Amino acid sequence: MSAYFRRKKMCRFSAEGGNEIDYKDINLLKNYITETGKIVPSRITGTQTRFQRQLAKAIKHARFIGLLPYCDSHR
């Protein structure tokens, strides 16, 4: 029985040249939040620590301004 081989995830931001993450780029930020509005951890996305911190800061900034929701729906 062969063991399951998990491929190493690559950091998208370091591969593109290490650009700064902008809080106004909603399409990019939506890739890193779940359907319920939570920030996806770096062990799942494969982002480096430096860029994960920038992502979290940008997502929180976009939430504060109102570009992203804090959660999916209020009941």
Curated annotation (Swiss-Prot):
It comes from the Bacteria. GO terms for biological process: translation. Keywords: Ribonucleoprotein, Ribosomal protein, RNA-binding, rRNA-binding. Coiled coil: none annotated. One of its GO terms (molecular function) is small ribosomal subunit rRNA binding. Transmembrane segments: none annotated. SUPFAM superfamilies: Ribosomal protein S18 (SSF46911). The keyword rRNA-binding applies. GO terms for cellular component: cytosolic small ribosomal subunit. InterPro entries: Ribosomal_bS18, Ribosomal_bS18_CS, Ribosomal_bS18_sf. Binds as a heterodimer with protein bS6 to the central domain of the 16S rRNA, where it helps stabilize the platform of the 30S subunit. Part of the 30S ribosomal subunit. Forms a tight heterodimer with protein bS6. Belongs to the bacterial ribosomal protein bS18 family. This is Small ribosomal subunit protein bS18. It comes from Legionella pneumophila subsp. pneumophila (strain Philadelphia 1 / ATCC 33152 / DSM 7513).
